[in-house]
Structures are given as structure tokens and as C-alpha cells.
Amino acid sequence: MMRIALFLATNFAVMIVLGIILSVTGIAGNSTGGILIMSVLFGFAGSLISLFMSKTMALKSVGAEIITEPRNNAERWLVETVKRQSQQAGIPMPDVAIYHSADVNAFATGATKSNSLVAVSTGLLNTMTEDEAEAVVAHEVAHIANGDMVTMTLLQGVLNTFVIFLSRMIATAVSSSRNDDGEETQSSGTYFLVSMVLEILFGVLATIIAMWFSRYREFRADAGSAQLVGKEKMIAALQRLQRVHDPEELPGSLNAMMINGKAKEFFMSHPPLEKRIEALRNL
């Protein structure tokens, strides 16, 4: 959840800034070709910046420390576990970090498999059994082995491109008119307003698609963990999470918007725990 939230937040912020620049300056012009080229460039810029900043941002956001020399048995176990599992998965050893938090959480991030990170909270190490923690770490290693951050970046880049392109094509059509001399003119104020509103609306639809893909990745990472440590350990870890907290709970802002019930699942980066457990049992 942490890596997805950071990725999408950064991507969205960059998209908004670049979108305003495009609208105010009119860089893309009115031609379909010009709008398409700028949509691709700016669409992928947001996701690529998010990708290459992901590791640094994740570390700073939770105050995590990369373990260079284990200071206790817990850190030693964590480093050895990540090393063993990364060898099993056939990927370079990721950086291993730990951060102080009561939350039972872990995440993996990084631009490439050779420049990746696995971070675990002290709350997870203190709450879960060794087998359960091992399964969670394997889940994060599987994310790296599957190249999930890169695939999410490519998907987000494509979605961004469509959001920018469609919003500006529609805005161009809505804001264009002909004067008394038959010359085509465009209202810059209308263009800016329409393009920004459409970008937000299309952005919501793009988020739903991105979250669907994120949930699919979680099922794959669960299966990857099962291959590394056995599905019973992963099931036990998910059952522990069920007892500890409700990972399906959404931020209050979404509840305030009356996004609840079945609709909530469209905006969740992770599938409901019961569905993940059922999928593991069916392996």
C-alpha cells in the first residue's frame, strides 16, 4: 500500500503541474499530432519521475534506515532472509531497511531489480511469528522479481497519456469557435477550465484501472511468496493481518465522498484478505 500511495501521489502531483503548464502556455498547440506528442512526453514524465524517486521518497516518508550492519538478532534475521529469498528468486540482493512504527507493514520499491528496497516495520517483526514475517518478506521479494514497479510505471504512463490527450482534444473542440470573418478562434479560459475538469474526471477512471492492476499484482506476489516459502506460511500471515487491522479501510476522504461498500474495492490497491486467502488455498 505504501509504495502504491507514494507512486500515485507523486505521479498525480507531477501530472497536475505539467497539465497547468500545458494549458497556460499552449505548448501542445491545437493540432492532433502536437497534442499527441506532448501527451506522450508529459504522460510518461510523471510516472518515470515517480519511479526514479520512489526509493528515496519511501525511505524519507517513514524514516526508514537501510541496514548496512545488523545491530541485533532481528535485523540479522531480516537481512539473511532477504538475501536467501532474493537468491531463490534469481534477483540481486535488494537494500534492506527497517523503520520504527507500530503498524504491521512492509513494502518493496525501486526503479530496477538491481536498485530495489525491501523495508519492514518494527511492528511487523514484533507482532508476527518468524514464519509469518518470512512470508511477508517473500511477498515483497516477489514484487521485485515480477518487476511490478516498472510495469506499473508503463501502465501509468499509458493512462496519463490518454488522460492528457483526451482532455485536451475535447477542450480544444469545446473552446473553439469561428468569428464573423470565418476565422477559427479559441477561448483560452474555456480551454483551461474544460481541460482541467476533464483531466480530473479521466484521472479518476485511470486510477480505477491502476488499482485493478495493483490488485492483480498482489495476487501474483502472494503466489510468488507461496513458491518461495510455502502457501501455508503466506495464508498464516494474511490471517494475522485480519486479526491485527482492517487493511480494506479507506481514507476518510473517500468515506466522506460516500465511496463505500462494493464501490470501495475499485479504489483499493490490495484485494480483500479473504479473497487473497482463497486464491492461495486454490493454488
From Swiss-Prot:
Q: Which GO terms describe its cellular component?
A: plasma membrane
The entry's Zn(2+)-binding residues are 139, 143, 218
Q: Which UniProt keywords are present, listed alphabetically?
A: Cell inner membrane, Cell membrane, Hydrolase, Membrane, Metal-binding, Metalloprotease, Protease, Stress response, Transmembrane, Transmembrane helix, Zinc
Q: Which domain of life is it from?
A: Bacteria
* The protein's required cofactors: Zn(2+)
Q: Which ranges does the record mark as transmembrane?
A: 4-24, 33-53, 147-167, 192-212
Give the location in the cell.
Cell inner membrane
What does the similarity note say? Belongs to the peptidase M48B family.
Record's protein name = Protease HtpX
Q: Which organism is it from?
A: Glaesserella parasuis serovar 5 (strain SH0165) (Haemophilus parasuis)
The gene coding this protein? htpX
